[in-house]
Amino acid sequence: MALMVSILAVVSACKTHKDTASEPPAVLQEFPETGIFFQDTVVTGDSLHCEGRILPALYRLMKADYPRLRTYLLSVHYPAKGEAPDTILLAVPTPDGAFGIYRIFPSTVMAPELAARYPEIRTFSGNSVDRPSEQIRLEITPLGITAMILTENGSVMIDPFCKGVSDLILVYHKKDLPPGAKQPFEK
């Protein structure tokens, strides 16, 4: 909690494509069942600081309603063998200030023994409703949400801003990371 207070007490050195808080995305009018789990945010102070965090050149800072998002994602159940997976629609922020709608379904990537040992980690896959070749992979853990969107223009990343802060996320193009920078999972 002290970390969150200190982060929210400082001003953004955030370099976004859009500096104002966003209205609910217009795309949700077409897909109202997706709900709104992400909102642009502005943090005030001299800088955003999180020990060990490497910031991309451009990014979008978002506030995530993580408890609601987690509940929504966990409402989709893994299919029984031979059955088609349940799917849900999820509005996912993009670095350019927009939202994409993705059809999300649970996916198994961990060995059964690991999945049984860590039931709080869930993984999902999906595709863009508008651009079916665009794929998303995402996971939820007690530490927050991470995602990678594979587009024809490169990868888009979604990461918690700081370890232990699940409701503040960065959305950015992987190409905007400094040369040689490693993702949090690569360290």
Roles of regions detected by a PLM:
Residues 2-9:
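Bacterial N-terminal signal peptides
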Residues 14-187:
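Zymogen propeptides/activation segments of proteases
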